[in-house]
Structures are given as C-alpha cells and as structure tokens.
C-alpha cells in the first residue's frame, strides 16, 4: 500500500480520491480467490484465462492537471503521482499490512514495537536494493526523516505526530544537527534502525499512523544535492532510484511514466514486460475506454459511472474509499518558523454560528443524488465508514440541509437581512465571502454555483475566487504555501486518508495541512486523547473518536461533505487485478491474457 499519511486529491469534489492504485498500491498481495464485495461492486476481477508471458499493461490516471513527479514521499503531495508511482514502490513504502491495515511480516522491512523501551525497531530485508543495485541501508530510512524535518528541504509534512520521536523537534528547529532518537545498531550501512519515542501510541500497530515513517530515500544517490534543490532535481523527479517490482524507464514531465521490470527487486519477478502509466483528462477518459486505449483508469469520478459501467470489454471493480471531502473556513495563518497554526484572521467566520449556518445551508444530499450515481453519500463526520470501529450513527453533522436552522443561527448572531439587497448585514458590513472552489469534473462549476445559490437563500453573499474556478495545482500552492493566503474565506477539499484514522496530521495545531488554520485547545485535547495510552483500550478509543467527531461538528471549523465508494474499470484481458486493501504483491502478479485489449 501507499503509505503516505494523507494525500491531497485532485478530482471529484475538490481534491479527489487516490483510490489507492488500480493495482493495489505499493505492492499489493497475492490475488485472492475470495469473493470480496464493496457495496454492489466486486473488489477483484477473476479472469478465467491465464496470463501470457510478458505484455504491456496500459494504465491511466484521470486528472485535469499535470502530474507533479516527486519520488521522495516527504516532498510529494500530489495524489495523481502518488498513485502513478505504485509500480515503482509507491515512493518506496516498506511494510506489508493485512486488510485491516495492521502491520504484518514479509515486506521490504518488518517493524517490531517495544512498549517497555518505547521503541520501534525497523529491520530491512538483507536483499533489499535500489534499482541501480546498491544496498538499501539504515541511513536511507533515517534520511527520509531529514527531508521532512529539516526546513531547508521545503517539505510540508512536518506534524505533531513526528515530534513524538526523541530529538526530532530539536533537529527540526535547528537546535541539533542530528536526530538523537534514531540510531543504527549495525551502523549507517546496516539494515537495522531503532526509533526512540517519548510515548507509545495505540495507533502505532497500524500503517499510516504518522508516528514513524514507512519509506526510504537513497541517501548516497542524493547526498550531494543541495536541500533547496532536491525537490526539483532530476534525481527525484525524472531519474529516480526505486525499490519496487518495476523501475521508471522514462518520465515525461506532467504526462506519463514508462515502467520496466526492476532486476534488483527483492520479491516475485513481474509477469509483465512493461507498464505505461499516463494522465488522461476528464473530457477524454470515457472515449479512451470506449476505444480500448487503456486496461485500467484510476481516478474516474462518480458523474462518469453511468457512461462506463456497461462498456464492452471492461469489468468495473469497487472498494470503500479511505476518503473524506469537506469544506474549510479560512480563520488564520500558518507560522512556519514556530510550526503552529494561528487563528487570528479578522472574519465573520470566527463566529461558530456563522460557520454552522453556512454548513446547514448546503444541499449535499441533493447534489449527490443528481451527480454521484449513488457513489457518494453525505458525510455525518470526518471519519469514513470503512473505519466502522471508530464511528457511530449517533454523530449528527450537516448531511441534511436545514435552511430554517441556518437562518435562526444568523438571526441569533445579529445578522439582519437587508431586504433591498437580499443579504445580511451587521455593524454596517455585509456578510460577503469569497469561495475558492476549484476545477474538477464537468459538474464542478454547476455544483459550486448551486452552493452559492443556497447560501444566498440565507442572506450570505458568496462569490467565486477571481470570478472563476481555480486550477488544481494553483489551488494547492495557494493553500499550502506558508503563511497561507488571506484572500479567500471558503474552500473545499478532499483527502485520501491514512489507514490509521487519527487526524493529527490534518487538524492538529501544528499541521500544515490544517488549511483553515484553526487552533482550538479542546480539539487538541480530543486528538491527543485518541492517541493516548488510555486508547490502547478499543472501547475507550472508540469513545474518544466519537467525542472528537461530535466536537468538530459542533465547532464547525470544517464541515464534512461526502464519503465515497471508489470504482475502477478494468479491461477483461487483465489477470490478477484486485482492489483488496490486504493485497500486497499485485504489481508483481498482475498480467494480461492476450496481446490486445478485450473488446467484448
């Protein structure tokens, strides 16, 4: 699996679903004969024919923005590329997991946790090598921490969770030149790393927990590149080293990756001779499938489902998404020097009643019914239903439009309706807000304009940012560049979530991805409680998650929008295709049953 903690998404509602990868993510497991279902979808395709020797798999990721190739996970935040990097190792993930996202043995590395000593010991495989044949070493694991914690590299993945590693905060702030809590029992060139924590956390047994990293970076290959140049270096963009079953032979900036087998891969040798992975636009994807151009397309959105569900030559697979879309309010800025969100913006949105009212005014269910083809449902909280052990139907959010309640909240807050304009005013100022909606599928502008009309019904004047939708990469830069822009009030976002559902990395006081920059002591307490020693008790942890969801809905710093089912069309010549989250070798095992794509 792709072990990024959280990933910005680039289609659907606003940031779109990473869908893991059409073929599992990093390395997906032995093809299962189990008949797994997600909703009405099969999770795996059982091709009755056997794979031929060799062949080229043709894969695409749907996006209306160019991919941003970055092979170091700590410097990457593009969902399109996160998925497209899968055949090469998913930006070099290390660990295998079961279908419940718990670590298991057998991957590129194993991890052993010790509660008494408060340590994690990572042991790399002896035969783990980079695609140039050089050894993957303990230093390569530690170097990934450097790229995130050293501000000179420009990573935006520093979080409170990582600060739980002894000495990492001092390294991050420049007080120390090395990371005291990461040591090498067999030396930097060995295969063992010990990570010392301040506290053990209940989520540490889960992949994506954020408390320790799950990737490596080729230190010897990169050590001579200046930190400020690393993100743009060909060594991390077009000519990388990888550890997966395939290696990139050719990377065309923004467009495509050609993969060939990695002769130094430690695991099962791939069945395919090559994989071509391209970006395809929303406008062209359905036609591309109709003409049998691709075996698989990732990232297709719900509004396209009716057009592809009965295409000849294809089987549509599905899976519950580790996904949440939401609405953000701009409440402050990010202090990069001190790694803290500061909630100091002068805006009517500082008032909880205003935030709640705007949330209640949206007609999310109506939008879903019209555009999602049954694949999206209004979200009652920020935790998707795939994590059912941490959710409760008792949590009530903003899934049902309630204009009466919205109007009442604004009335209580002193916002008076000016009958001549149709908009509310207070202290001589109109309630006027800027909506930074962004380009998505063909319905994106229709949906944005719909919400603007709903807000008008409660007397809130909302206009699009610069009068139009924002291009995705421009939107990302606008939201992620510290200290954060002051020229927007509302935006939408969606995330491919980690397989450990704690949301420290999204909404903690230190999280750069806390786009609205709220900083609330009660929410901080809730997040810390979820990850406390008490939460090693599953019943306690569920209660902590439920309280967090209730408090977030009440305070309305962000408003949950949708949960999703992912779907992926797969050509019927493909063998070994599964979306099972517990699959760990799919890129090696996937093949094709004929040289040409199936057409019926």
UniProtKB/Swiss-Prot annotation:
Q: Where is the lipid attached (N-palmitoyl cysteine)?
A: 23
Primary location class: membrane
BP GO annotations? peptide transport; protein transport
Secretion signal span: 1-22
Specify the protein's topology with respect to the membrane. Answer: Lipid-anchor
SS bonds (residue pairs): none
Gene Ontology CC annotation, any one: periplasmic space
**At which residues does the record annotate a lipid attachment of kind S-diacylglycerol cysteine?**
23
Q: What InterPro entries does the entry give?
A: Peptide/Ni-bd (IPR030678), SBP_5 (IPR039424), SBP_5_CS (IPR023765), SBP_5_dom (IPR000914)
Q: Which UniProt keywords apply?
A: Cell membrane, Lipoprotein, Membrane, Palmitate, Peptide transport, Protein transport, Signal, Transport
User: Please, which domain of life does this record's source organism belong to?
Assistant: Bacteria
Question: What's one GO MF term for it?
Answer: peptide transmembrane transporter activity
The listed locations are: Cell membrane
Q: Does the keyword Mitochondrion apply?
A: no
What do mutants without this gene show?
A: Mutant grows only on di- and tripeptides and is unable to transport the pentapeptide Leu-enkephalin.
State the oligomer form and interacting partners.
Answer: The complex is composed of two ATP-binding proteins (OppD and OppF), two transmembrane proteins (OppB and OppC) and a solute-binding protein (OppA).
Function summary: Part of the ABC transporter complex OppABCDF involved in the uptake of oligopeptides. Essential for uptake of peptides larger than three amino acids and for growth in milk.
UniProt family annotation: Belongs to the bacterial solute-binding protein 5 family.
What the entry lists under PANTHER family is as follows: OLIGOPEPTIDE-BINDING PROTEIN APPA, PERIPLASMIC BINDING COMPONENT OF ABC TRANSPORTER
Please give the name of this protein: Oligopeptide-binding protein OppA
- Which organism does this sequence originate in? Lactococcus lactis subsp. lactis
